[in-house]
Amino acid sequence: MGSVRTNRYSIVSSEEDGMKLATMAVANGFGNGKSKVHTRQQCRSRFVKKDGHCNVQFINVGEKGQRYLADIFTTCVDIRWRWMLVIFCLAFVLSWLFFGCVFWLIALLHGDLDASKESKACVSEVNSFTAAFLFSIETQTTIGYGFRCVTDECPIAVFMVVFQSIVGCIIDAFIIGAVMAKMAKPKKRNETLVFSHNAVIAMRDGKLCLMWRVGNLRKSHLVEAHVRAQLLKSRITSEGEYIPLDQIDINVGFDSGIDRIFLVSPITIVHEIDEDSPLYDLSKQDIDNADFEIVVILEGMVEATAMTTQCRSSYLANEILWGHRYEPVLFEEKHCYKVDYSRFHKTYEVPNTPLCSARDLAEKKYILSNANSFCYENEVALTSKEEEDSENGVPESTSTDSPPGIDLHNQASVPLEPRPLRRESEI
């Protein structure tokens, strides 16, 4: 009789439980075994939403309120604006009420509330709680109407005026600092940093590559921009421990430095699927039946404030398009470059993309088709060039050296010089 696991993250305590978890892991193509069962599983809950928010809830946190109050400044910066305004108003009103009560007690103990008393009062014209409250407001806000003022009759009253002035300055500094820090947060900068809706896998420089596109909608630059990516999936260790979210780094050029990007126009981030890649053994069929999530991160400093911002998104396995490329968005004109963001999320299919894994491709188990086939990006670039020439009055055909039997497509299919694997805008 198998044992029951009381904790979903505990060590597997029996062979039966181990077989159950092994079946779960093998089903999505990431088990420890060599066989893969291609059965479509229910998609996992997204760990990072498309807008960058983490889909995580914290429960059973001990002394949560005390911990948040201990770091009250960060708490005020992180909370919503409506709660910030509530704290702003309460801080001033409570301080006015507190010192108003103090001045009223001083007047009460000194006998200033007795109208028949003719001796000098501690605070002139303070003969009720309302008057004491108004004097407190005038002192802390330095209004000074002139009717109510402290005298030298009571040293304690003089001390309280000085003390309230200091407390008022502290409250002003704290509130203004929190509001300015909240306004200067680079969080809203992420609204103008966009990731493509889908990632793609296609051939680039003779190798299978995972690619996604990132763009900056503002003209202001993102200083020291760099990208990172991680693959999240569940796995079982050799000791039988079930890890629900194992994080594996995806190399996007950290060693060579090409993870640092100049984000002026949309850029395609490229991950070469080599022997060190977690996608090395996955074919198109494996991707279609896999259950994992790729988290992509863009970091940099906001040019206006020099504060670091981080933009996040993620791609599930069913959001990766095998055999697709992104449509070009950057077009060269006479005096400038233009970016067409209506094409930012669009892809087109590349029919000759191998369906096997990168391992099988590296081991020559798949024969590639002619690499010099006419490319869609070349067609778009040539079409744009022809339109520009026609607008300038240049004849469409100006070359007389080409043989009559060779068309434009064959001319465009001349092999180009191999270029190093770098992420760039595709023209």
Swiss-Prot record:
Intramembrane segment ranges:
129-140, 141-147
Topological domains annotated Extracellular: 107-128, 148-156
Q: Which GO terms describe its biological process?
A: cardiac muscle cell action potential; cardiac muscle cell action potential involved in contraction; cellular response to mechanical stimulus; magnesium ion transport; membrane repolarization during action potential; membrane repolarization during cardiac muscle cell action potential; positive regulation of potassium ion transmembrane transport; potassium ion import across plasma membrane
Localisation per UniProt entry: Cell membrane; Cell membrane, Sarcolemma, T-tubule
Any one Pfam family match given in the protein's UniProt record, by short name: IRK_C
What Gene Ontology cellular-component terms does the record carry?
Answer: dendrite; dendritic spine; glutamatergic synapse; intercalated disc; membrane; neuronal cell body; plasma membrane; postsynaptic membrane
Q: How does it assemble?
A: Homotetramer. Homomultimeric and heteromultimeric association with KCNJ4/Kir2.3. Can form heteromeric channels with Kir2.6/KCNJ18. Associates, via its PDZ-recognition domain, with a complex containing LIN7A, LIN7B, LIN7C, DLG1, CASK and APBA1.
Q: What is this protein called?
A: Inward rectifier potassium channel 2
Lineage, highest ranks first: Eukaryota, Metazoa, Chordata, Craniata, Vertebrata
